[in-house]
Curated annotation (Swiss-Prot):
The encoding gene: APE1
pH note: Optimum pH is 7-8.5.
Biological-process GO terms, alphabetical: cytoplasm to vacuole targeting by the Cvt pathway; proteolysis
Assembly and binders: Homododecamer. The precursor form of aminopeptidase 1 (prApe1) assembles into dodecamers and further aggregates into higher multimers (the Ape1 complex) in the cytoplasm. The Ape1 complex is disaggregated in the vacuolar lumen, but mature aminopeptidase 1 (mApe1) retains its dodecameric form. Dodecamer assembly in the cytoplasm is essential for formation of an enzymatically active complex. If cytoplasmic homododecamerization of prApe1 is disturbed in mutants, homododecamers of mApe1 will form in the vacuole, but they are enzymatically inactive. Interacts with ATG19.
Natural source organism: Saccharomyces cerevisiae (strain ATCC 204508 / S288c)
Protein name, entry field: Vacuolar aminopeptidase 1
Cofactor: Zn(2+)
Record's comment on post-translational modification: Synthesized in a precursor form (prApe1) that has an amino-terminal propeptide. The N-terminal extension of the 61 kDa precursor is proteolytically processed in two sequential steps. The first step involves proteinase A (PrA/PEP4) and produces a 55 kDa unstable intermediate (iAPI). The second step involves proteinase B (PrB/PRB1) and converts iAPI into the 50 kDa stable, mature enzyme (mApe1).
Any further remark recorded for this protein: Present with 5730 molecules/cell in log phase SD medium.
Length: 514
């Protein structure tokens, strides 16, 4: 479809803008080359799954932290005429009676984008896709300084979720995240995003097996998984003693001067101007299409940049189709932080950004309070999170007829004990949505002797009262530093989510009072 072609072209341009700015002549040449390539290769979504997979790989590589991901989506939304609304502002004058396309951001890591039709009313509810954008990572400690160990420079870090295990050893790790700084002569604190890619600045070395039992693990996460960042010599460039000006930074003494100088240079500020920082370590190796028949996509941080990416691209594709002056629908993608550590933060699913957006935007739109109970009773929330592909090396852990395989379609997550929010009506609704959109649906449920993971689904269901359905794109090697999915699965996710926005209201109406 034409609108999906335009989205892919814009996505490519946005990804390029987030790297090195080319010269004008090179930029024109590249744009002409892209246009020609797109004219030859891009027709409709179903025939270009590999193109979408490659765009996803580039997106993952160029946006290694949650801050970068949300910033990227914000820029993409800007380019597609979504209007930014500050949470700190009054929305009454920003959302008119004609509705429109909007987004807001909390903490730089929690984003909600929405489309509000002119003819919407409370009885029409809201069509929601909720996902999480955080991924397992390693965090720099507030005081990361460590004395050198026989000349080795090291930094103190802490696991975010289930990391700093054997899977993180011997990986090329970059560093990136958000810096807060205050320029000299001003009182305004600003932020900057930094990213060392493609340079791996550190590594957590394993112990050779020749040393016997100490090399076997498990390893102490405090003392045996410390990243090594260098082996500096006294006379090398950049190893000069800290200057009096550098000592003025609140971070001086908390982090090694080499690291402070490095990240300050990335941000284009001076060490003395640094106020605070939130930095992650991450695998810098770029993802790739793999398998002898190109059936797979291998990349880091799939959980859950996978569903987040597919959902946001689907919303933007849908926005190209919808005329807000004629529409009676309210559609949103809301992306959360901190799912991997329980969601109980202001930027997590339990922080209530979705509920806030619906309440504030609906009352600004109607110019009067809206009965939110009516809104949520008529709404559908898709809790989109990755689930588990069948691993052929461990067939005994899977429930027969309840596991997905690659490159087939979206997977419903089911659990009779409430770890997933999907109910029988939700299952039937998804199957009908898939039928209308030409998609296939797979099931995933654990065996009785296994434990279930969790999603944001039960939280959103209990906080809103809306019917909530847990589903997602399936992957192998969940919570590994590198994982895999089907090479068609990103595109299949975009296709299904786009169909959800188009059809959810008419399908849900068929269920009446159920």
């Amino acid at each position: 479809m034409e609108e999906q072609r335009e989205i892919l072209e814009q996505l490519k341009k946005t990804l390029q803008m987030l790297t090195v700015e080319p010269s004008k002549n090179n930029q024109i040449a590249n744009e002409e080359k892209e246009k020609k390539e797109n004219e030859n290769s891009w027709c409709i979504l179903e025939h270009n799954y590999e193109d979408i997979a490659q765009e996803f790989i580039d997106f993952i590589y160029k946006n290694p932290t949650t801050y970068h991901v949300v910033s990227f989506f914000a820029e993409l939304l800007d380019k597609h005429n979504f209007k930014y609304l500050s949470e700190k502002s009054n929305w009454q004058d920003s959302i008119g009676e004609d509705g429109g396309k909007f987004y807001t951001i909390r903490n730089g890591t929690n984003l909600s984008a929405f489309i509000l039709g002119k003819n919407w009313r409370a009885e029409k509810g809201v069509g929601v896709i909720g996902s999480h954008v955080d991924a397992l990572t390693v965090k720099l400690k507030p005081v990361s300084f460590k004395d050198t160990a026989e000349g080795y420079g090291r930094i103190a870090v802490a696991p975010y979720g289930g990391t700093l295990n054997e899977l993180w050893l011997d990986r090329d790790l970059g560093i990136g995240g958000r810096l807060l700084y205050k320029k000299k002569g001003t009182n305004e604190i600003k932020s900057a995003l930094v990213d060392s890619t493609p340079l791996p600045v550190c590594r957590i070395p394993s112990l050779a097996p020749h040393f016997g039992k100490p090399a076997e693990g498990p390893f102490d996460k405090e003392d045996q998984t410390i990243p090594v960042i260098g082996f500096p010599t006294p006379d090398e460039e950049g190893n000069e003693p800290p200057t009096d000006d550098e000592k003025k930074s609140p971070l001086f003494g908390k982090h090694c001067i080499h690291l402070l100088r490095y990240v300050a240079k990335l941000a284009g500020v001076e060490v003395s101007e640094l106020i605070q920082m939130d930095l992650d370590l991450f695998d810098v190796q770029k993802g790739t299409i793999g398998g002898i028949g190109k059936h797979f996509l291998f990349a880091p941080r799939l959980d859950d940049r996978l569903c987040s990416f597919a959902a946001m691209i689907a919303l933007i594709c849908y926005a190209k189709d919808v005329n807000t002056e004629e529409s009676d629908l309210f559609s949103t993608v809301t992306l959360y932080d901190n799912e991997e550590i329980g969601s109980l933060t202001r930027q997590g699913a339990k922080g209530g950004l979705l509920e806030s957006v619906v309440e504030r935007s609906s009352s600004a739109f109607t110019k009067k309070p809206v009965d939110l109970h009516t809104v949520w009773a008529n709404s559908i929330i898709l809790s989109a999170d990755v689930n588990h592909l069948y691993n052929p090396n461990f067939p005994e852990v899977y429930l027969k007829n309840h596991f997905p395989v690659p490159n087939v379609g979206i997977t419903l997550s089911l659990d009779p004990n409430g770890h997933m929010a999907t109910d029988v009506v939700g299952t039937a609704l998804v199957e009908e949505l898939a039928r209308r959109n030409g998609d296939k649906v797979q099931y995933f449920q654990i065996k009785n002797n296994s434990r279930s993971g969790g999603t944001i689904g039960p939280s959103l269901a209990s906080q809103t009262g809306a019917r909530t359905i847990d589903l997602g794109i399936a992957q192998l090697s969940m919570h590994s530093i590198r994982a895999a999915t089907g090479s068609k699965d990103v595109g299949l996710g975009v296709k299904f989510f786009n169909g959800f926005f188009k059809h959810w209201r008419s399908v849900y109406d068929e269920f009446g009072e159920l």
